[in-house]
Amino acid sequence: MKKNIYLVTKYDEVNLRNGPGLNKLVLFKILKKGYPVKVLEEFESWYKIVDYQKREGWISKTQLIKTPYGITVKKDRIYKFPNMQSKQLALAKENYILKILKCKKDWCKIEDTQVTGWIKKKSLWGID
C-alpha cells in the first residue's frame, strides 16, 4: 500500500489552483503557514493536494515543505503526558495547527508557541 505524503505550506499565503500552472485559476488562498496538505499526485513542478476539509487543487512545489504539522479536526485536550489521567495543559480548538514532535501509538507530542504536550492522534489530520 502506498504511504500518504503530507506537506505543509511554506508561507502565510499560498494559492490553490484548478490545474498545474501559474496561468490556472486560483480556487482559493491558504492563509496560514504550516497548513498541512496531503499529496494526491505530482506533475512537473506541481502537486495536486487535498486538505482535511476535502478541498482539492494544485500548489507549486516551491510553496510546500516537509515539516511535521497537524491540524486539529475537533476540539481536544493537550496533556502533560500521553494519557488522560495526566495534567491537562490546554484545550486545542478545532482547526488549530500544531507542530508534531513525535507520535507513539495513539498519541502525538505537539508544540505551539504556548504549550508543549500530548494530544490524541485521532484528533489530528496530517499524520498517519
Predicted regions and their residues:
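SH3-family beta-barrel domains
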Residues: M1-P20, K29-K33, L40-K80, K87-Y96, ...
